[in-house]
Amino acid sequence: MEEIQRYLQLDRSQQHDFLYPLIFQEYIYGLAHDQGFNRWILLENPGYDNKSSLLIVKRLITQMYQQNHFLISANDSNQNPFLGRNKNLYPQIISEGFAFIVEIPFSLRLILSLEGKKKKIVKSHNLRSIHSIFPFLEDNFSHLNFVLDILIPHPIHLEILVQTLRYWVKDASSLHLLRFFLHEYCNWNSLITPKKASSSFSKRNQRLFFFLYNSHVCEYESIFVFLRNQSSHLRSTSSRALLERIYFYGKIERLVDVFVKDFQTNLCLFKDPFMHYVRYQGKSILASKGTPLLMNKWKYYLVTFWQCYFSLWFHPRRIYLNQLSNHSLEFVGYLSSVRLNASVVRSQILENSFLINNAIKKFDTLVPIIPLIGSLAKAKFCNVLGYPISKPVRADLSDSDIIDRFGRICRNLSHYHSGSSKKKSLYRIKYILRLSCARTLARKHKSTVRAFLKKLGSELLEEFLMSEEQVLSLTFPKASSTLRGVYRSRIWYLDIICINDLINQK
């Protein structure tokens, strides 16, 4: 971010007012693709070179306003051969650059708030990991009873996302350009259904899509800040946690006025001291220690409020009320539940002995084996029953490249599911990938699996078959002697910032 501040050379208090001129600055598009800024990007969007010409960018914006619909001339293709192979290069450059520009004021506000507090910055990077959610669930969900499983709907219209940015970005020219860009290039209704969004807009413009979508979701999530502050049993949340919001206190006052006007008689229903909210991508969880009646009231009041004030059209059937003790919650690639562990304690007083039965609630995380096998079958590693099959590969790939690809997939899945309470399902996934790799190699050499392994030996699969215990010993070499048996327990890593494609497939 120091490079951003040096490039911009603008007054900090006025950066969010003059974003439009930055669109015509060539270095912005270089920074947008700089590998050094990958830590600020959730998902990379490769597919074109990192050098963007200022002439190309200016020509694209001119064509947008002249209704030329992103025509690429022959001269452009001759100057840059890559343009002939990718007709979406122009819109991708603009979307990446615009996403980088609108993120600048929010990133700088975060840095300003944490200046001189480097320890907190380090902690904020750790909290970016998906696995950081599960320690929070372990500490809190074991004491809760019911959970609302919420599927967040997509905005009805992209115009809603643009209107949300008006609270954060005051530069009207930039917002007009964004609206025009979305109207000309993207399907305005592409976000109504997830399938259309994943196939058209979000895949090619992931960074811009996630920024617009998260900004809209953060708007309606502000209601939870108000409800938490209204609870007499909870401490108020510092506004530092919502630094990306402009006029935070003004919005809170507006929410107070809304509730006093429309929900005055029912405000006491939200006095729940054990309400917790977690969200990732298009799914959120609202858990409480309250009764089913209270949770149903939460459900209908929140749905009504979101529909009236945020144009977020929830269907009541998209919100499921379940009891944690007898229901497994599917969230970010895990099946989570709260189960009772019975333990018997023998107590003896003088000559009399007693057996005391204790039931302790424990947060349990399992690997969803059936959806994961379905993802492997979709990727042609096995059939729908989980039987490994050979995967067609290019003939010019060497055996080591094939083994490395299969091994990388296996290690990524093992790394992500290291927090599973039971490893048997994970071992089954490893077996499928291992045998699929062997069948693929045997198919390439036109031989059987047994003959291939007998001829070349099993040492070729050593890297592929590296156990989790060996990975831990490499990660913590000084403490390898004390890690025996640790691999059998749950381990949460703080370097996982995105879900593997095999885990995220539906």
UniProtKB/Swiss-Prot annotation:
Coiled-coil residues: none
InterPro entries: Domain_X, Maturase_MatK, Maturase_MatK_N
Keywords: Chloroplast, mRNA processing, Plastid, RNA-binding, tRNA processing
Positions of transmembrane segments: none
Superkingdom assignment: Eukaryota
Compartments where found: Plastid, Chloroplast
Secretion signal, residue range per the UniProt entry: none
Main location as per UniProt: plastid
A GO CC annotation given for this chain: chloroplast
Family membership: Belongs to the intron maturase 2 family. MatK subfamily.
Protein known as: Maturase K
Protein source organism: Olea europaea
